[in-house]
Regions:
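Helix-coil boundary/capping segments in enzymes
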Residues: 1-170
Length: 170
C-alpha cells in the first residue's frame, strides 16, 4: 500500500529527524509562474531591458509533430495551466513522495541575454525567486529541496559577487 502525504495541508512542520539520503534527483528544473520573476530583476535592468521582453512567460513551438511535454512528464503540468515544475507542492508529491527521491537539487534554467550585465541581473532575479518560492520555510518545510545558483559566466565579477551572496544558503 502506498501512502502519499497531503502537501497542501497547513501543518507544514520541519521533520524532527533527518532521513538517510539514498537517492538524489539532480535534474529538477523549477520554472517561475507567469509574471513571477520580473519583480525580482534589479533596476535599472527591469525597466530598461526586461519590461520590453516577456520574462518568465515562455512561448514554445507546439505543433502536432513536436512532443508537448518537451521531455518532461506530461502529468507534471499543474492543473492551473502553468508550465511543468512551476508548482513546488506538485513537484514534492511527484519527485519525493511518489518517485522516492530523498533530496532534489533545484537547477532553474535561465536564458542568456545579449548584454552580460542583463544576464547577471536575470541570474540575480532567478536566485532570489528560487530562494523565495522554493527554498522558503513554506515550500521547503520538509527540507528536501537544495538550491543551485545561476551566474553570468560572461561577467566574471558579477558571478563572483553572486556566489559570495549565496554561499551557505541551502
Amino acid at each position: 500500500m502506498t501512502v502519499t502525504a497531503d502537501t497542501t495541508a497547513t501543518d507544514r512542520v520541519t521533520p524532527a529527524e533527518r532521513i538517510a539520503v539514498r537517492c538524489v534527483d539532480s535534474d529538477v528544473h523549477p520554472v517561475p509562474r507567469r509574471g513571477e520573476l520580473v519583480d525580482y530583476i534589479p533596476e535599472p535592468w527591469r525597466s530598461k531591458y526586461f519590461r520590453s521582453h516577456r520574462v518568465g512567460e515562455q512561448i514554445f513551438y507546439d505543433a502536432p509533430d513536436y512532443a508537448h511535454s518537451y521531455a518532461m512528464r506530461v502529468d507534471s503540468f499543474p492543473a492551473d495551466g502553468e508550465f511543468a515544475c512551476s508548482d513546488p507542492d506538485l513537484a514534492l508529491k511527484q519527485l519525493i513522495m511518489e518517485a522516492g527521491s530523498d533530496i532534489a537539487i533545484l537547477e532553474p534554467i535561465h536564458g542568456e541575454m545579449r548584454i552580460p550585465e542583463a544576464t547577471a541581473a536575470f541570474c540575480t532575479a532567478t536566485n532570489l525567486w528560487l530562494a523565495n518560492h522554493w527554498l522558503d520555510a513554506h515550500n521547503n518545510w520538509h527540507e528536501r529541496w537544495r538550491g543551485s545558483i545561476c551566474v553570468a559566466i560572461e561577467d566574471p565579477a558579477s558571478a563572483v559577487a553572486e556566489i559570495e551572496t549565496w554561499a551557505g544558503h541551502p
